């Protein structure tokens, strides 16, 4: 948890999640710069396996913000979300005639930073979606 006098930033980190970074980034890109409630709705409706650990992480960060600092969950938004590569688990797959093929099982580290929306005046939300991306909250 990072505390500044201007705006508190609540950080939650999940390490060694047994998933490739590519699959986790596909989900993280959808919730970046969204409000806490929008992020929860998006994650509950997306059909990917990466949604569950990210949903747990965002919920944990919001609970920490509410309990430790006393922030309202309705005013929080995801100011930073990133996925980095973790350690690679190396295994061996038995093959014919006593051979063994190497198997690499990737892991990733997920970082979520929540911030209070009322105190962050310098955030500019994009009005038009990027070309080729699906927009969840069209009005």
Curated annotation (Swiss-Prot):
GO cellular component, one term: large ribosomal subunit
Keyword Manganese (UniProt): no
Keywords, ordered alphabetically: Chloroplast, Plastid, Ribonucleoprotein, Ribosomal protein, RNA-binding, rRNA-binding
Molecular function (Gene Ontology), one example: structural constituent of ribosome
Pfam families referenced in this protein's UniProt entry, alphabetically: Ribosomal_L22 (PF00237)
GO biological process: translation
Keyword GTP-binding found: no
Location, primary (coarse class): plastid
Annotated signal sequence range: none
UniProt subcellular location: Plastid, Chloroplast
Quaternary context: Part of the 50S ribosomal subunit.
UniProt-listed NCBIfam families: rplV_bact
Protein family membership: Belongs to the universal ribosomal protein uL22 family.
Function according to Swiss-Prot or TrEMBL: This protein binds specifically to 23S rRNA. The globular domain of the protein is located near the polypeptide exit tunnel on the outside of the subunit, while an extended beta-hairpin is found that lines the wall of the exit tunnel in the center of the 70S ribosome.
UniProt name for this protein: Large ribosomal subunit protein uL22c
Organism lineage: Eukaryota, Viridiplantae, Streptophyta, Embryophyta, Tracheophyta
Gene: rpl22
